[in-house]
Amino acid sequence: MLSRQVIGLCFMLASLPLRGAAPLATIESMLLKPAVLCGRFEQRKQLVGLKNAVNSSGRFCVVAEKGVLWRTLQPFPNTLRLTRDEIVQMRGDQVALRLEARKEPTVRLINTVLFALLAGDIGQLEKLFDIDGSVRNNSWSITLKALEPGLAKAIGSIALQGGVHVRSITIHEPSGDRTSIDLVAIETGDSAMNVDEAKLF
């Protein structure tokens, strides 16, 4: 018969977060992979030297095989549409900026990283980052450190947390600036996108 001490140790070990390669497979199995995922975001950017954070909020959509829509509604309306081949910034119905991957090679990398972060694409993230993950109950967290020096210089380190979807993203930039993004009110399926968002794709 197991002693109370051994039983207690088993419970203690079971409650510790899992780490290493195995948890990444567990995390990947926990994440749903809908064709369409939309929700609201709340973003806080803390800049070095500024006491108050810069806050913004809006809606986002991640559409498989198409890209990402990032619509800032507050404090100023601004829309970013990121696809495999381009980044388009829109103000109202007007295109304010267009960056094409055939002219700017980094466009494809930026879009790949953002899509993987929002969708929780562990396989894609493993190609670009050194990943350390942990799982506790129905939640998980991972930290990302870029493998390529150029990407590391631009991004720094990233922390993700979530369950069946990514729920928060924190980016620690090399400059010391920090961006925290909470993803809330997440919906999936074609009905998750409103009419205006669907038109942008």
List where the protein language model places each region.
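Flexible, surface-exposed loop/linker segments and immediately adjacent secondary-structure boundaries
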Residues: 94-141
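Gly/Pro-enriched, hydrophobic low-complexity segments
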Residues: 122-201
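Bacterial N-terminal signal peptides that target proteins for export
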Residues: 1-7
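Short hydrophobic/aromatic-rich beta-strand segments that constitute the beta-sheet cores
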Residues: 41, 62, 68-72, 87-89, ...
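An acidic-aromatic
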Residues: 59-109, 179-180, 185
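Bacterial N-terminal signal peptides
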Residues: 8-15
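N-terminal leader/targeting segments and the immediate start of mature chains
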Residues: 17-40, 46-52, 197-201
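Amphipathic hydrophobic-ligand
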Residues: 52-59
